[in-house]
């Protein structure tokens, strides 16, 4: 079986593109991707989540709300979630955020001025809107600009388009560097071949 992985690496971000042949199993369904992320969060000891509503990762929200080991808080603005996550970390929790990439754009200053300045390692999982088969035109400008914005702010990020495999290694790097890391979850993850 021939599987090719292409990595495009900038100073702060890694984009993974995995090309698969016909012998490779199809992309997991939406629920499979969300379940893999849920299992990753549990396995890595995350125990506090901040979420902002998003239709793409709604199945993951349901899984988290039904779990007794992870406390999940819904916020009304993503910047609010940055502050809540920072407070949870300082209180001894291992927090993560689930948001849309548009909200990530709104939160860049809070991430840089709070999380980066005080070396708070928050995992930010964002559904990556505006770059792949986007049906809402208003999402496209930020979707195109987001990787450049993250690079400019020196915020490490990873774009997952076909597989969740690089996620664990990326998070190990986050904790060893004590700084926030962003994972952009492409809609491609949620498609079936």
Q: What positions do the PLM features span?
A:
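Thiamine diphosphate
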Residues: 4-193
């Amino acid at each position: 079986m021939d599987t090719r992985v292409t990595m495009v690496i900038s100073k702060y971000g890694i984009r993974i593109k995995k090309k698969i042949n016909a012998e490779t199993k199809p992309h997991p369904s939406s629920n499979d991707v969300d379940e893999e992320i849920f299992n990753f969060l549990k396995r890595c000891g995350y125990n506090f989540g901040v979420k902002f509503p998003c239709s793409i990762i709604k199945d993951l929200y349901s899984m988290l709300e039904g779990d007794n080991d992870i406390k999940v808080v819904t916020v009304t603005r993503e910047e609010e979630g940055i502050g809540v996550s920072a407070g949870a970390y300082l209180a001894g929790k291992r927090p993560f955020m689930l948001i849309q990439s548009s909200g990530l754009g709104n939160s860049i200053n809070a991430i840089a001025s709070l999380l980066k300045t005080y070396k708070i390692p928050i995992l930010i999982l964002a559904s990556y809107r505006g770059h792949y088969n986007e049906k809402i035109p208003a999402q496209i400008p930020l979707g195109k600009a987001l990787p450049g914005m993250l690079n400019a702010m020196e915020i490490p990020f990873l774009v997952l388009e076909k597989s969740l495999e690089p996620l664990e290694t990326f998070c190990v790097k986050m904790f060893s560097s004590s700084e926030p890391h962003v994972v952009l979850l492409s809609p491609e993850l949620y498609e079936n071949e």
